[in-house]
Amino acid sequence: MTKWSPNGNPLSTIYLILSLFTLAHTAPTTQHSRTTTQLRLEDEDGGGGVDEDSIHFVKGQMEKYGYLKGIDHSSPQEFRQALMFFQEVLEVEQTGNVDEMTVEAASKPRCTQTDVRQEQTKRTKRFTLSKRAKWAHASGQSVTLKWYISDYTSDIDRLETRKVVEKAFKLWSSQSYIKNEKKVTLTFQEASSKDEADINILWAEGNHGDEHDFDGANGKIEGNKKENVLAHTFFPGYARPLNGDIHFDDAEDWEIDVDQVGHGSNKRFFPYVLAHEIGHALGLDHSQKADALMHPYYKNVPINEIQLDIDDKCGVIWNYGGASDFCLYVWLMSQIVEAHNSSAQNNHGVGSITSSRTNKKSFKSEGFFLFQLKFPHSTLTHTDDVVMREKDKRSYRGDSKIPKCSSNNSSQRTLAEKKLTLGLHLSEADAKRYTEMVCNFLAGLHMWRTNPNHHASESLEKEYKGVSQEMGTFSGKSIAVRRLIRHAEHQKERSEKGPLDPDYFDDDFFENFFMEYSK
C-alpha cells in the first residue's frame, strides 16, 4: 500500500510515555550540556536534598520533553512551576523541588516522544493533523492499514509475537468509539511483505539506519542516572518509507508474560509498549492523563485489560472523523476550567467543592491547583485501579472551581475567546460566536454541580488537570469547528434546542455526558 510522504519533522524516538490530539514532534535533542549560566544549584534543588548530577538529569529530562523552553534561560520561579507540572505527569507529589522521588520516577523507562509542545511567541500556523499526523488514504471516517513484522526478536516465539500484535491492533479498532459520537472505523490487516505494509515492525540494535540509534540494554548513563529508550515510532506524516513504522531495541530482554516483569526484573513488557506505539503510528501524541494509554510512561498491564481513555478515543475521533461536540466539551473542561483554576482561588462567580478523599492529595502552590495520586504509577495494577475508582466514586465531592460567564465576570468571556482564537485557530468573529456555547456549557455545568441530587464522579475532577496533548490541540481543524458553529446557528434559526440555547445544557445533558466521560 502506498504511503503518504509530505515533508515533516521526524518523530522523536520513543521510550514511551501517553487525551486528545495529535501533532508530530522533532527528534529528541541531545542532553543539554552544563554551563555557568544555568540556575544556581540551590535554586534548582529547592531543598530536595539530591546531588548535582541528579538535578542536572531531571533538568535535562524536562528540557528534552518540553517542560522547559531552555534550562539556561529559566528563572527559579519558571523552573519550579515547570517542575511541578513534570512531577504531576510523573505521579509524585508536586513539591517544586528536585527530590529523590522525582529523580526515581524520571529514571523509569518511557517513550522518547515530546510531552509538551511549547507555544509560539506569535501566531503562526502550525503543522496540521492532515499533513503530519493522519494517514492520507483514510477514506471518510474509516482507515485501513496493513502491518508487517520484518525482523523478529529471539526473546519471544514468532507465532506468539504475531498474536500479540494482532491483539494490540484489535484493541484500537474495537475501543476507539464513544457512544452517540461519529464512528471511526479502524481496520488492520497483516501484509504479505514489508513493501506492502503501511506499518513495518522490527527489532534492531544500536545504529539501525534511521538516525535514532538505540542505547542498548538498560539504557545509557546521563549524569549518574540511566535513560532507557525501548522503542521509537514514526508518525504518519514522516518521510516514507519510515512513516508509521515501529522499532524496538533488541538489546533489551522482551517478555509477553506480565508475571515475569516488574519489580526486580529487567525484562520489558512488549504488549503494553506496542499498544502505546500503535497510538503514535495512528498519529496520536502524548497525554498527561495517567489513565490514558498514550501517557508517556510504561505500565505493565496485560493487553486484554487495557481500556482506552476518553483522551485516546477523542484523539482518534478528531483525527479521522473530524470535529466532535463531545470532544470539544472535553477540551473546554481541560482548557477553560483548568486555566481558571490555575489563576483564580476565590473569584466572584465561581462555585467550588471540597475533597474528602483519603487516597489522593491536593496541593496548592503558586496559584496552581494540583491533584495527585499518593502511589506511583509503577506500583498501580489494573485491579488496584478499578477498586480505587469505585471507592473514589463513593467518597468524592470534588475540589475544583467552575468559572462562570456573567455580566460582572467579563474576564472569563475574554479568556474563552482568547483560548478559542489561539487554540482552535478561529477568527475573532467565530470565537465570539462559539463563546456563547462555551458560556452556556459552563453555566449548565455550574448548575448541575450545585444540584442537591448531584453525585459527581472522580473523573470530573481528574479531567480538570487531565489535559491530553492529543485532545488539547485543535490546529488544522478550525474549519470543522466552524461547521459545528453553523449547525448550532441553524438549530437556533429553526427554533430547535441546541448549544446556543442556555437550556440545552441541563441535567439530562450532563448525566449523559459524564456517563460516557467517566468510563
Swiss-Prot record:
Modulation of this protein's activity: Inhibited by human TIMP1 and TIMP2 and the broad MMP inhibitors BB94 (Batimastat) and CT543.
Primary location class: secreted
GO biological process: collagen catabolic process; defense response to Gram-negative bacterium; determination of adult lifespan; ecdysis, collagen and cuticulin-based cuticle; extracellular matrix organization; heat acclimation; larval development; negative regulation of protein import into nucleus
Top-level taxon of origin: Eukaryota
Protein residues bound to Zn(2+) 1: 208, 210, 232, 247
Annotated catalytic residues: 277
EC number(s) on file: 3.4.24.-
Phenotype when the gene is knocked out: RNAi-mediated knockdown causes a delay in larval to adult development with reduced motility and feeding. Also reduces fecundity in adults. Larvae have molting defects characterized by incomplete cuticle shedding leaving a constriction ring in the larvae anterior part. Reduces survival upon Gram-negative bacterium P.luminescense infection or heat stress. Production of extra- and intra-cellular reactive oxygen species (ROS) and protein oxidation are increased whereas vit-6 transcription and dehydroergosterol (DHE) uptake are reduced. Moreover, causes constitutive daf-16 nuclear localization.
Tissues where this protein is expressed: Expressed in spermatheca and spermathecal-uterine valve, weakly in vulva and anal muscles and in two cells in the head (probably RMEV and RMED motor neurons).
Spans annotated as Disordered: 29-50, 391-410
Protein name, UniProt field: Matrix metalloproteinase-B
Native species: Caenorhabditis elegans
Encoding gene, per UniProt annotation: zmp-2
